[in-house]
Amino acid sequence: MKCIKHPRIKLLLLFFLFSSLKMLAQNGTVTGIVKDAAGNALSDASVVVQAGKLGTRTNADGKFSLSLPAGVYTLIASFTGKSLAQKQITLAAGEAVSMDFSLADAGDLEGILVIGSRTPRRVSTETAVPVDVLNISELAIVAPQNNLNQLLNYVAPSFTSNTQTVADGTDHIDPAQLRGLGPDQVLVLLNGKRRHSSSLVNVNGTPGRGSVGTDLNAIPAFAIERIEVLRDGAAAQYGSDAIAGVINVVMKKSTNKLSASLYGGGNASTGANDHRGGMDGKQVQLDLNYGLGVGKGGFINFTGSLTSREDTRRATDFNGNLFNVYNAIENRALTGGVNLSSLFSNVNNTPNTAQIISTIKQYAPGVSYLTAAQQTNIQNATTISTLQGILNANVTKDELAFRGLERRNFNMRIGQSKLQSGQIFVNAELPISINHRFYLFGGYGIRDGNSAGFYRRPNQNRTLTEIYPNGFLPEIGSKITDASASVGVRGKILNGWNYDLSNTYGQNQFKYTVENTSNATQGINSARSFNAGKLGFMQNTVNLDLSHEYDVLAGLNLAFGGEVRLENYKITEGDQNSYERYDINGAAATPSTPATQLPTDFFGLARPAGAQVFPGFRPANALNKNRTSGAGYVDVELNPTKAWLLNAAVRYENYSDFGNTFNYKFATRVKLMTGLNFRAAIATGFRAPSLQQKYFNSTSTQFTGGVPFEVGTFSNESKPANLLGIPKLKQEDSDSYSAGFTYRVPKTSLTFTVDGYFVKIKNRIVLTGSFARPGGTPAGDLLTLQQLFDQAGATSATFFTNAINTESRGIDFIITNTFKYSDFSLKTDLAGTVSKTQKVGSIQASDILKNTGNLNNYFSEASRIYLESAVPRSKLALINTLTVKKLEFFLRHTYFGSVYDPNTADVNGNGLVEGATVNGQFIAVEHPIYGSRTITDFSVGYEISKAFRLTMGANNIFDIYPDRNLKTQTAANPLVGGGYGTPGTIDLSNNNQFEYSRNVSQFGFNGRFIFARLSVTL
């Protein structure tokens, strides 16, 4: 070790040492322990000086030490889920004082917030914008729900999320919305750090269509202490996506405690098992959480979660045609050892015509229920075309009886998907020194899902009856892997500056496997399962945040920082047989392959390419795209007086792919009287188009009115988009305004809050309606477009585009109260929201789209409904929690407002689907309305001992279902040029299969769910 030789440096060090000792001599010290009402030490509780900048946190043993100059102080102790406690102290120079705090359970969560304010010790009632604090660790014990999306759906009225059905990948990741805006217009944070989004784009007919959200269910609820929901625009503080607000998930920090939960339940409903009653949708979940104390105030907290969930089935029996005469004869031939369909690949181009005709005549008599006339006609036929007319007759009833089948054997799987998942998460903070801490948190999860598409019936050209004589139900298997890790260091530097330097990595992969299916163009050689490719999204974010509190006026907090983010999006192609169209020789077909060389069914209909239900991603779909962004912000909070708070924030952000944006926010809170606050905010915001929206492209099978269509989603930068005049994507911009009041009745726990808001969004990104493939023999650009459709195997196409402007407005209110007497306590929460979102102004489209009359394809009437009316405009939750000694009763009523179906029908029964002139065209605008419902949840918990607790109850205890779908009807639809056409069939139930709408639902349609949960704490 080298000695210090320079005398000036020695003098300087002695000066600093002397100054430090002098300062310590002038200070006093306050030490103590913070405990809960039961006497348990609270780790990481906050102890701060009221209206000051000094404070500390407790260590793993609940102990704290705070050095203060001589004076009179009010110290406030707080911990999430506990009431604040404050004590006054007079401290002399050099004095050491001991002061302990005991924190009772809070009626509302008043703990120190991570979001909404960059002042380190701001509580929810002090913020200038509305922030809800939800005690998820408590809800996860008493509530019937066991995943994060559903927990929030029933406790936070401004939040909406439901499981989807028959919607491809969206069956496996539930879209979530805040304040009726899109799933991608709410920012999700984990411990205050930006969470990565899902790799999945919602392209099917569900709320949130065209959006990319964050998979909240990738975070186990058992790992969560609380959730903070900022219900206000916050892009100036947090960056892209925070238009509707911010959801911050705060992980558990507990130490020296093992917690476990064993959960089981199922849907005991009259609608279970395709409306035959009993129970389905059985679930089992095991959760474990354990924390270790490390050093002085450090901790490592682990959570593991395993889930197994069966599917639910809510289909009704298909009432359409299943079998034709050809299916019956083919069946008799197979019984006789002859594969009739193997005699041809293309029925119009086969050397086996005579043998086919002969075989049909040979086995036709085995179909005993055919009439004599039918048998005679078959025996007299001399050509395939003649037989096609005869053998296409419907014989479903008789053939079902012959095969010993019922119509329910052909039911779809309509309901929640199957699920197997495993997750492990960690949250750690380790002291480096008195002023510096290292932290690490994140997790890894695997989720295997299985859902089903539309049943492929024997009489369809999509079905290889030589493989599946009775048709088949194709399945979509998903393997979702989600990984995240945040590492950083934070503390104090440079005379009181708080700093936080971190790196956050996250990735999400969605791998498709198509099962119990076939590629119809391969015939008998087709595989039964396919690797259909995968999607991948990666995000890496580096943040540096600095803040300092100053004794200016009644308090000033200055914060600034920067962010650098890298994003990557990948589409990986599937195996060739998952997407390819093969010719009759087994070679890959091309757009120039003659029709005579393409496989057909017996009736001459071309076999569709690729794996049924989800054709795999093609090499042309595969891509690997990156972008970077950088941002800087300044955030200032000033208290001119103790009763007045001002907040201002500005943020500049630059993206490598579309340029820069500048946003600001101003907010204020005024204490009007004891307990009564007024708050208001004005802000601009933005959302960058996601890489998924810019580059996603694929071909999928979508059903409209029970008819399958191969719909291609072309990227915004593709040639088809250019030929149709689809503009390049740019960011969404927003202006938001909010104002409200909070009131806490003095000397009580009764609290009222009400907030109104108004949000304008410009250049909102949507997924267009379908553009049909050009028919005939076009020339020029139309010919090019036709060829591009054919290369993608698509009959229609959709695109992502900035099409519209919207306005959203609403009112949120919350009332909370806790009444306690002896061993009795009653906590009551009433929360509600009323909101409205609507398109405003004209559709933003190119002249090409306007001149070709394509505006109503560009932004369709169905898209308008998904935007404005597919989620409830009103929602109300009344929650009562009654505790009597060792018993706890949980009762919740949740009101869901009405929603509109994006499909149109003759709702009023006048024989017409009412129309209106939109963009110069007369289109259908009459939509089914599904009325409001109130869902009741109830549970009873009993504390067997300090270590064991048993909770039993039900979600939707009265087994409530949404309104049923309209049945098949005959009505006239509007004609584009005006008037109404010839009456035709309208069937929203797809031949009676969908008892409830598959497109919208306020609360799902699984009915009553009963559960039991054993909680263990050691």
Spans of features found by a protein language model:
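Short, acidic, small-residue-rich periplasmic hinge/interaction motif at the N-terminus
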Residues: 35-37, 45-50, 78-82, 92, ...
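N-terminal periplasmic accessory domains that precede
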Residues: 97-101, 148-151, 176, 215-217, ...
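C-terminal beta-signal and adjacent terminal beta-strands/loops
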Residues: 198, 760-762, 836-839, 894-913, ...
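Extracytoplasmic beta-strand/coil segments of soluble accessory domains associated
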Residues: 149-199
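Short, acidic Ser/Thr/Gly-rich low-complexity loop/linker segments typical of extracellular
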Residues: 53-63
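Short acidic/polar hinge/loop motifs at secondary-structure boundaries
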Residues: 65, 193-231
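Outer-membrane beta-barrel transmembrane domain signature of Gram-negative proteins
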Residues: 466-468, 472-487, 492-494, 505, ...
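Gram-negative outer-membrane beta-barrel transporters
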Residues: 756-761, 768-905
